[in-house]
Swiss-Prot record:
One of its GO terms (cellular component) is cytosol. Signal peptide: none annotated. It comes from Helicobacter pylori (strain J99 / ATCC 700824) (Campylobacter pylori J99). It comes from the Bacteria. It is found in: Cytoplasm. This is Triosephosphate isomerase. It catalyses: D-glyceraldehyde 3-phosphate = dihydroxyacetone phosphate.
Length: 234
């Protein structure tokens, strides 16, 4: 399976720097990168999607066409920008913004109905990890229960919460075991990405694991040269 690199800017990139980054990345890449490189700026960092060398996606959207949803963007906003790729289920939205499994299912089903490419994020906390691998498997299985695992436009990203933003990635053995388990659950055509303190120093080793189909990169993607280095490993 072709390897993938995704940059999640979260809320860390200044707006105009984000715009400049996207334009410079477009100049750097080639057409064959279009379905292999993805960038998720924050809402203000989004531009009309005329990019031909990478895929532009949104970090979040409310599951409605439009309406009285103060502070949200909806499918019509994204479609107007020609954006059809969306992150759903990131741990920061689950934990900080209290997005429940039922709401994530609603969001998934709505954007599946719009034929969006959905990057669905899962991952366990440290307490669960410390209980052992059986507990991790049960936790991750529950996170996948409410979505259609045979949806053809699905990508799953495994991000252990305890590794996000800590500068301490999961060990290669942990990634190998966890991805091996998840591959047994997922449709064989569904790409499975790893995220959690991925950087230019560890990306090549992680991508070397057969069951890792790509990377979801946070802070290490904020500097274009770092992201370009990671892309070179694909």
């Amino acid at each position: 399976m072709t390897k993938i690199a995704m940059a999640n800017f979260k809320s860390a990139m200044p707006v105009f720097k984000s715009h400049a980054y996207l334009k410079e990345l477009e100049k750097t890449l080639k057409p064959q990168h279009f379905d292999r490189v993805f960038v998720f700026p924050d809402f203000l960092g989004l531009l009309p999607n005329a990019f031909l060398h990478f895929t532009l996606g949104a970090q979040n959207a409310y599951p409605r066409d439009c309406g009285a949803f103060t502070g949200e963007i909806t499918s019509k906003h994204l479609e107007e920008l020609k954006i059809h790729t969306l992150l759903i289920g990131h741990s920061e939205r689950r934990v900080l913004l209290k997005e429940s499994p039922s709401f994530l299912k609603e969001k998934f089903d709505f954007f599946k109905g719009k034929n969006f490419k959905i990057v669905y994020c899962i991952g366990e906390d440290l307490t669960t990890r410390e209980k052992g691998f059986r507990a991790v498997k049960e936790f991750l299985s529950e996170q996948l229960e409410n979505i259609d695992l045979n949806y053809s436009n699905l990508i799953v990203a495994y991000e252990p919460i305890w590794a996000i933003g800590t500068k301490k990635s999961a060990s290669l053995e942990d990634i190998y075991l966890t991805h091996g388990f998840l591959k047994q659950i997922l449709n064989q055509k569904t790409p499975l990405l790893y995220g959690g303190s991925v950087n230019a120093q560890n990306a090549k080793e992680i991508l070397g694991i057969d069951s890792v189909d790509g990377l979801l990169i946070g802070s290490a993607s904020l500097e274009l040269e770092n992201f370009k280095t990671i892309i070179s490993f694909l």
